[in-house]
Amino acid sequence: MSEIIHRQESFEIMGACFEVYKENGPGFLEEVYHECLKIEFRLRNIPFLSKEPLPLTYKGHRLVTSYEPDFICYDRIVLEIKAVTSVADIHRAKVKHYLKSSVLRLGLLVNFCHYPKLEHERIVL
């Protein structure tokens, strides 16, 4: 059996996500969940960067375009949040691109508009 990377940190991040879902439920805009998570992360002392640009390169040349994941927590976990009916392959691909363009190995994809419970996936490179 393979080791689960960043087990404790991802557990703490997901705890904050579950709390936001419990308080708000589904149906809000993604930006609302984003703001609520920033508050919840501060309350739980979870270190995070919000919308921090990830630089992109092509053949050693830095691109003007960059990726901006919703959160980078603990300097090692990408958290991408959604407020959609269901998570699609394009959402998973987006998280994988974030990981490929950085040194990070773990991404969490969380959908707050799924009912009756929070939808979430771990994506590991």
Which residue ranges define each predicted feature?
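Nucleic-acid nuclease catalytic cores
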Residues: 82-125
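A short acidic/basic microdomain associated with nuclease active sites
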Residues: 42-59
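Conserved catalytic cores of phosphodiester-cleaving nucleases, focusing on short active-site segments
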Residues: 25, 69-87, 98
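Solvent-exposed, charged helical/coil patches
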Residues: 1-47, 123-125
